[in-house]
Amino acid sequence: MLLLANAPALWKLIDINSLLKTLIIILLALYTLVFMFKSHGRKGSHGKIRRLDSGAFVLGCGVLQSVIQLIIVIVLCFTKLNGWRLLANALCAYAITTLLCLSGIVRIAASARQVKILWYVIMLFTWYIPIVNCIMFRKFYKAARSEYYFEQAKLDLDAARKENEICKTKYPILMVHGIFFRDWQVINYWGRVPNELIRNGAEVYYGKQQSANKVSVSATEVAERIKEVIAETGAEKVNIIAHSKGGLDSRYAISHLGMDKYVATLTTINTPHYGCKFVDMLLGKIPESIQGFVDRKYNKLFTALGDKDPSFLDGVYDLTYKNCSELNASTPDSQLVSYRSVMSKMNSIRSAGFPLNIGYLLNKPYGKGNDGLVTVESGLYGENAKMIEHKGKRGISHGDVIDLFRENIKDFDVREFYVDIVKELKEQGF
């Protein structure tokens, strides 16, 4: 490819038959096209992982070629080539090297999840600017290569332990979502987690309650779903893993709706068991007219998206400190169910984007730490409570803990985190 990139200069410097030169250039052009579009991924890899590896390889070759080409340009300046020939050679080299890099970028864009959208925007406006584009190409290469190694390691790990079925629990797993979301088929609330559990032997089902409503209403829907799963699987009970308000819904169903005889374990993830005091503060300051306006718009939107009778305000009010205190007083834990809770926290306002970064600031006066929505004190519930300790400045947000952004976070593998939870359930006979 370097030969093709420097064809204008080599045409003048190499004294051979013109027809032979033309033939060589055609062959070099064909080779370059094949190289750009051929799969270069690791043997044994497949699908997006292979495309990601291939894209990183092609982009890496392009970046390396750009460095070598810079040296070649300097050397050519000391030859007998005239200015026009040097300019033509430089333009040819620039075009071929850029096409090579863009070929890698396209493959990465088709398969990578860890490349930031902002990078694509910057690339769109700077791909033709020398040096700047090289800096961006390098960023893409490092991100793609890092993601490839991480994902391939996950696949290798799953393959090595596949026969052990470490997540094959006695009872099926029921994953109950939090407020303002639904269990859509296209966009999974739990990100990459369910597939990871299934690959390791778990039987996974979803709560399918509405996006927002009173705890008592959502709990009724969760209770119906528990009965459906038991009827479908023939299992005696289910293991519930619930995030955010889903934990309150599940506790209500267990204690008030007779689901304790059908639930073996309840694991709550970042659930506001003792409420969100900043919600009390906001509701006390926002005029009722604005609250009503937001409620109507939200309910209309989510009715169109599949909810039967959503209620934004009812759901929000049941997250207040006052309502959660009343819920706790009237909802004792069942002796038939094994409870455990998990909580995380953000370490700075930069740990997450909007609206969790705003929630982080609003929550600061009410506890020693929070995840952007729930304080640590509110999320740790019962005797079997665990705090996720994350090294570094980032921390783990309310969204990170359910893989909302599908991001590979350094020192926190969210998929393996859930594998460990379910693995422990299996080891304990659940």
Regions found by a protein language model. Give the residues of each.
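Generic hydrophobic alpha-helical membrane-span motif
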Residues: 136, 183-184, 250-252, 276, ...
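Serine-dependent carboxylesterase/thioesterase catalytic core
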Residues: 4-20, 177, 204, 220-324, ...
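Active-site catalytic motif of lipid deacylating hydrolases and related acyltransferases
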Residues: 165-237
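Surface-exposed, flexible loop/turn segments at secondary-structure boundaries
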Residues: 181, 212, 246, 274, ...
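Helical cap/lid subdomain of alpha/beta-hydrolase-fold lipid enzymes
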Residues: 37, 44-88, 262, 268-430
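Structural motif
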Residues: 165-166, 230, 258-259, 331-334
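Flexible, membrane-associating and regulatory peripheral segments of lipid-active enzymes
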Residues: 1-186
